[in-house]
Amino acid sequence: MKKTLLAVAIGGAMFATSAAAVDFHGYARSGIGWTSGGGEQTALKVNGGGSKYRLGNETETYAEFKLGQELFKDGNKSIYLDSNIAYSIDQQVDWEATDPAFREINVQFKNFAEDLLPGATLWAGKRFYQRHDVHMNDFYYWDISGPGAGVENIDLGFGKLSLAVTRNTEGGGTATYGQDKVYYIDNNGQIQYRYEDRKADVYNDVFDIRLAELNVNPNGKLEIGFDYGNAHTKNGYHLEPGASKNGYMITLEHTQGEFFGGFNKFVAQYATDSMTSWNTGHSQGGSVNNNGDMLRLIDHGVVQFSPKVEMMYALIYEKTDLDNNQGKTWYSAGIRPMYKWNKTMSTLLEVGYDRIKEQSSGKKNDLAKVTLAQQWQAGDSIWARPAIRVFGTYGHWNDKFNITDRTNAGYKAKDAEFVAGVQFEAWW
């Protein structure tokens, strides 16, 4: 309740300042679905994977509400306050209460040093920082978002430089030389005690350097990034033996504009040790299970075959090779063609395939899904939103490892499911 009142108070204060000047942006989706096996809509995702092809395959109500306002303006200089509160619920009943997530609250000072760094922006606070993603499967492959600070868009003449630092904290990842007596009940119902090391959080800082808008060919631009993650603790505490402590990630992304009426992005990334847990740019230096490296290649984009037909596509290869032999390789491919009947009605087909290969055994888990959707949207672009869609989704999987993850959920290791439903999606 306190968090809800805080959100209302922030929104009210911003509107009270100057209602006409407040920017309101956001994202939302919700709907209803049924599963052939009975019950509510089931999400179809490969066993061991972190992403799924999303058309006709999202089972939650999710929303982000962004309020922002320019608080200062003097010539080319301006100060902007931005905020973002997000909600996620299971879309099961009428009244579903949840605590909001305070995803963003930051201030951006544009042209803060106009004479020295024209066009550059100084910022501080919690922020979605220059995120890069594959829309089809909601996969954010370069995302260091969190509390932080930085200077971005420093014009070097041949490109733009951005510098930032953000933080993500691991709970209970360190120990101290002190111990606490912990009581527990044994298998015979007797009260026993043992001594356990005191735990404290691990603080992971990520230092981010990006050089963007490098013109390398006609309508083609290159972005280069280096992220270094480093863990530190409070005085008197230490990382667990074998903890990765630090690591780095290198990213190269080439964006080709005017590509068959759309665009193409090719991405190559390499990460080590603490940067391999999430494989996105966040660091987990307190972990003892992420020593190793990761290589990822992505090709994704949108093409327009005719005024009536557009298509999204994605190809992903990601290999995480860990010293403890617990890594995996992820293969993914998907397409989403769209046929436009008119400016506000279209038909979409999404075909997606994911495979996870276990490092230790070489065994593989596979999942393929196909979705057919009839859609009504605000415009004739594949990016047009809001949209309301009626969909049917068929998924088939075949698991060879971690089978209990599937069977404990009431499914067979090799099985299939059909899902149908209605969903809206909007961004503004």
UniProtKB/Swiss-Prot annotation:
Keywords: Cell outer membrane, Ion transport, Membrane, Porin, Signal, Sugar transport, Transmembrane, Transmembrane beta strand, Transport. Pfam families: LamB. Residues 1-21 form the signal peptide. SUPFAM superfamilies: Porins (SSF56935). The record marks Y140 as: Important in sugar transport. Induction: By maltose. Belongs to the porin LamB (TC 1.B.3) family. Involved in the transport of maltose and maltodextrins. Homotrimer formed of three 18-stranded antiparallel beta-barrels, containing three independent channels. This is Maltoporin. It comes from Mannheimia succiniciproducens (strain KCTC 0769BP / MBEL55E).
